């Protein structure tokens, strides 16, 4: 396609009547406007957009027509103004956010997109290891697998990660208890539950949960004796 003055407006390829392969467009002043790829009419892969003055405007990737991964937006003077992460079209977070903002975002995402919430929590744990929100995030991941997804083996894995990564935290005690509880009351693996409860008593002899753990062990021993 061309503008009335003969300047190129669009350069595209089609397959079966749909945009396919590389695509480029220009402003009327001759500056590049956008460049990327289509696959059977859908934006796919890396795309770049420019302001009319030639400065970068937006840069990122599409997956099946949805913004995906890291996207960077620029002001007309060329300065970066926002770096964001997307997951299949859903905005996850701004890369400039700290752990508190990210944790709040993960809590909100939990209500509508659990997998995306877990991605944000992973980012907190990996990027802000010394923050209290890293501990909270790892524990919340375990809670999501336990209560929302009902994936009990994954919940055990995530609770154990709390114990390993944040051994002195209050959440570590709660996590070791939950590992024991899942084995005993959900998966009915009483032998492993007994082992985990004993591990709890060894690691946390002064915990507020000691009485509850001793009671659980007593009940486990009783059930195992009757079997």
Give the location of each predicted region:
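Short solvent-exposed coil/turn linkers within tandem alpha-helical repeat scaffolds
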Residues: 17, 41, 65, 125-134, ...
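TPR-repeat structural position
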Residues: 114-115, 152, 190
């Amino acid at each position: 396609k061309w503008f009335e003055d003969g300047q190129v407006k669009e350069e595209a390829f089609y397959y079966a009547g749909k945009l396919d392969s590389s695509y480029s467009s220009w402003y009327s002043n001759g500056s590049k406007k956008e460049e990327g790829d289509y696959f059977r009419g859908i934006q796919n892969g890396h795309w770049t957009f420019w302001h009319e003055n030639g400065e970068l405007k937006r840069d990122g990737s599409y997956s099946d027509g949805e913004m995906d991964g890291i996207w960077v937006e620029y002001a007309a003077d060329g300065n970066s103004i926002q770096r964001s992460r997307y997951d299949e079209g859903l905005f996850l977070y701004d890369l400039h956010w700290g752990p508190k903002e990210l944790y709040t975002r993960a809590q909100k995402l939990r209500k509508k997109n659990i997998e995306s919430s877990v991605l944000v929590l992973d980012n907190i744990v990996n990027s802000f290891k010394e923050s209290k929100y890293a501990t909270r995030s790892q524990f919340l991941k375990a809670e999501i697998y336990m209560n929302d997804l009902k994936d009990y083996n994954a919940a055990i894995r995530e609770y154990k990660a709390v114990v390993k990564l944040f051994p002195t935290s209050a959440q570590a005690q709660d996590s070791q208890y939950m590992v024991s509880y899942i084995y005993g009351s959900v998966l009915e693996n009483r032998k492993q539950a007994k082992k985990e409860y004993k591990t709890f008593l060894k690691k946390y002899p002064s915990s507020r949960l000691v009485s509850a753990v001793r009671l659980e062990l007593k009940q486990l021993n009783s059930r195992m004796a009757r079997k």
